[in-house]
Regions:
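Functional transmembrane alpha-helices
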Residues: 1-135
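Cytoplasmic/organellar membrane-interface segments at the starts of transmembrane helices
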Residues: 59, 115-182
Length: 182
């Protein structure tokens, strides 16, 4: 979300469009990640990472879906998060390369933590917890994940659907903001 703040404070049309797009993407990705955490809790009945491990062995479909959303969280190419952050950085590079450098360090740190978390949940040693192994991913969960994945990749592969709606309104917002500053 730091990229959103950087996109908003520059008063640049490209950055504002990227920030709004990133907010939309963040709503999809964070909602999906919270839904994944709910799915974990439904199966493991624990909330602490130290008790989770070996999820890939017991629930491979659910852990693969979780991987896709974790990669979207770190702005993997092809996802909507990548488009939003890429557009913000395109506009930001004209304003301040120092801010781009600091934000890039933050993105790298976030990616390391995200991948470490996924590795710990999916591939660590299997913990001896009482697990009800009914289904890997039940039908209702699968349909919700399918809808979230559809929008994640739709906006990642065809971002003009949203950007065409944003062009004029972002231009108007920037013009009003510049008048307020003067």
């Amino acid at each position: 979300m730091n990229a959103v703040v950087l996109g908003l404070i520059t008063l640049n049309k490209i950055n504002l469009e990227g920030a709004i797009f990133q907010m939309l993407s963040h709503g999809i990705v964070s909602g999906a990640l919270f839904f994944c955490v709910g799915s974990f809790y439904k199966r493991y009945k624990v909330r602490s990472l130290k008790y989770l491990g070996g999820f890939m062995q017991t629930y491979p479909i659910l852990s693969t879906i979780f991987l896709i959303f974790m990669l979207a969280n770190i702005s993997f190419p092809g996802t909507s998060s990548f488009v939003g952050e890429f557009v913000i950085f395109l506009g930001l590079i004209n304003n301040s390369t120092f801010l781009v450098f600091i934000a890039s360090l933050n993105m790298i740190t976030g990616a390391i933590y995200t991948l470490w978390t996924y590795n710990r949940i999916a591939f660590a040693n299997f913990k001896n917890l009482i697990i009800q192994k009914n289904f890997d991913c039940d039908r209702n969960e699968f349909y919700i994940y399918l809808i979230l994945l559809y929008f994640l990749f739709l906006l990642g592969l065809f971002p003009n659907v949203v950007f065409e709606l944003l062009h004029m309104s972002c231009f108007t917002i920037i013009e009003h903001a510049k008048l307020q500053i003067l």
